[in-house]
Amino acid sequence: MKSATCRLANFLGCFFLVLSSCVSGIALAADAEQWGVWETSLDGPREGDPYLEVQLSAVFSRDGKRIQVPGFYDGEGVYKVRFSPPAPGQWRYETRSNRPELNGKGGSFTAGPAAADNHGPVEVFKTFYLRYADGTPYHQFGTTCYAWIHQTKELQQQTLRTLAVSPFNKIRFCVFPKAYTYNQNEPELFAFHKEAEGKFDFDRPDPAFWRHFEQRILDLQRLGIEADLILWHPYDRWGFADMSDPQDDRYLRYCIARLSAYRNVWWSLANEFDFMTDRPKNHRGNKQMDDWDRFFQILQKEDPHGRLRGIHNGRVWYDHTRDWVTHASLQTSNMAGGVGYRAQYQKPVIYDECRYEGDIPQGWGNLTPREMTQRFWLGTMSGCYVGHGETYKHPQDILWWSKGGVLHGESPQRIRWLRDVMAQAPSFDELQPLGDDQGRYLLAKPGEYYLLYSPDSRPQSVDLAGDRPYKVDLVDPWEMAALPLGTAQPGEYTVRPAKSDLAYRFTPYAPGEKLRPEAKISASPTEGVPPLTVTFRSETDAAAAWDFGDGATSAQNPATHTFEQPGFYTVTLRVTGRDGGSAVNQVQIAVDRNTDEPIVRAAYAEGETPALTMKGTAKRGPDGIIQLPDGQPWGWVKAGDGVLEDLRGLRSFTIIGSVKPDSLEIGSGGNRILFCLNKDHSGIDLVCHPDGRLRLAVNQWPDRIRNDSSPGKLVVGKWTRFAVTYDATKAADNVRWHFSRPQDVPEAAAVALDRKTTYNVGPVAGDIGPLAIGNFNETMHASGLDRQFRGQIRCLQIFGSRASGRGAMSLEEIGKR
């Protein structure tokens, strides 16, 4: 793996490399290294339209191998042919053209051996994997900067400096500029000539742009980074997405002729290809499904260097089983599906877009750093490759995902650490993904290496082959730490994670190697409210050292510690034997918030939390009542500024409130009383249906679930008090619905149990959306606001617990609120 220091040194040396190339000129043009670029320039016709009228290619031959390479027009009467020799030795060439002054030109050149840092192009290996042409392993850790080459020169240089010290060895970016949210700047250069009146001539490439583009590909190559070139996309205001079929084909062939000789080039036919066909709002394109097939066939047949070929999806997935697709380039957040995607496509699978780390309102751009890191682990453990992106708000809209610049997030350093972990393991192509699509993640070379990942805290088992004991290491992806956990005997071994997001590494002891001591912990109690005093005991005689996870430590055994603040604390015990060997173990202590205090208190005359902002037609009534009139343009209530942290990860919760519908007419799927899903997943959604029943969805879109109250509980023109509880610690009857009788005035009324339902999808996920009352939040506004609750809401409260079932209140507790 190329180090960041080495990358930076290479980048700083680029100027001198370019300078020496210019000085040596003809000498360098006459020779090349294996997998480098050899180029010849020819003088030809200037008159007419060379791009449309002149055909040029050359046949390169060596030892009976013949390769036909297309040429291209570079402006000012200059024609070029570029070739990347796949083998060292003497190569001969002869040009072919429909113009006599370009036809029959020939000669020879010598390709030398590849330089030490030139491993050749990346290619598919053993069905599911990637490697360099010289056999060097290549484990893709990608990132995305869609429009970085369309920014100022200063910003492009800053992006290169950032990449030089990053963990990324592939970057996805577009040939054409992008017109989209946070992307409104006008580039200096375009792929085609811009006429005086502002229109583009799609039959006349601009050589200045292409020379600039090539330089950026070479800049990346010197940093050891693959350039995944996106040829089309639907985010366009200049017309590039709507070129004619002949113009599209000529453009593609021009890209092949100019760019395929660079060994770090990959082809991505499109970003969200299907959005150029069905054209959702603010998307452009005139492509049909047959067009994408044709483009792939052109690449497959006419790219003389056989670069990798993929296509990125929006909602519709391309058929990646087709033989002209070399790898499956996916946009999906289904990280559990990796093993299945490999089996389905029988090709390398790359999660090129699994959402981005950031803080923008859009659901695709607000992963936490921990979630971005976790997705890299989940994809890797499934035998797949993963891509990164970053979308933190910036006063000048310089978001890495599109414009580059600098990285602000916390996931890149952890992605680097994962890359180091994998570099220390057997080669990726030797590791089998032995997990499934149900939450089991195991990567193994049986008998030699096992890496078991636990995204949650459920116990998991692994069957260790052979007759030697194994060293067990506790691997913490977020803390970037690998700790000696102890010893596992061959056979079935069960891990019991102290917290979520941990991995366990198993490697056999060498013959004669001393076994580690055992670290065993007992702790009581393990959960409660602050101040919580816990007694810890090490169950071995070895010297004990405790780290309580809140900055406090102890060398006593037993040890007692008091936790003063709510939180989840990972307590670590390290034991050291007389021979100096050590091992660790961990236990998690859950110190819960006071569940008697509401997380949300809304639609009150005073004492609300968090602060509420009325949006659209939403307004206040007497005593803080929220009024949501029936009819366009609709309204909603914003609760707080961004995601409410205390709603993340709730294992149990209670929602209490009073509602008075003015109408039970609904938008598609039902009207929202409260909504904190992140688009269509992760969070809580409480929905009103036209027959007066409510539905609760957790972490999923509600349309296909059946977790409902009885019908007829809400009545038009009447106030009804309700309470719904959810308890993920219970296997059955974990949801309880309570309602009062409908009444004319908004007074406190006793509720009674309506029904119990079994609906358990686990705790509320961590990557929730912001809370909205009475309608969708910002992550779903693009789908319309007619899902507004049509009426009034009063005294709405949410209580919850991350640690236990205490957040699901009893009927008696509800009656006190």
What do the predicted segments below correspond to?
Residues 100, 119-327, 331-337:
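Active-site mouth of glycoside hydrolases
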Residues 216, 227, 717-728, 737:
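Short tryptophan-centered beta-strand motifs in secreted/extracellular beta-sheet-rich domains
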Residues 306, 322-396:
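Catalytic-core region of carbohydrate-active enzymes that cleave or remodel glycosidic bonds
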Residues 593-611, 619-622, 630-697, 729-734, ...:
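Extracellular glycan-recognition modules
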Residues 748-792:
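Flexible glycan-contacting loops in extracellular carbohydrate-active proteins
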